[in-house]
Amino acid sequence: MNIDGKYVSEDRNFILTITNSNGSGTFDGTYVSKYTPRGEQTFKVTGRWYYVVNETAPLSLGFTAFVRPDGWPYVIEDAWTGVLSQVGKLYMTGVRSYLPNGGTAVLSSLGTFDFYAQ
């Protein structure tokens, strides 16, 4: 099954573009968060996905994305997990950690959303 494509959250604040998905259960791609403590960010991602019973939907998938600029002034890490409930639709829940240099860590929920293929 090929899960490559661009998936946009129902609130349009998160975009996952999956490329190079393969039968070994991994994929590459990009992830955009329209809001972070540092404004909109684009992350490179490597994710994983797993079939249950057979090679069709539903399937489990997840990814972690982080950004840490040169000089390491902060790190933002988002993690998402969920299912491809049917072809073209992801049901995902996400969390974030944000750690600024010399600051206090902030942990937050990103929410639970349907993501639709565009």
Regions found by a protein language model. Name each.
Residues M1-T81, T93, S97-Q118:
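Central antiparallel beta-sheet cores of small beta-barrel/beta-sandwich binding domains
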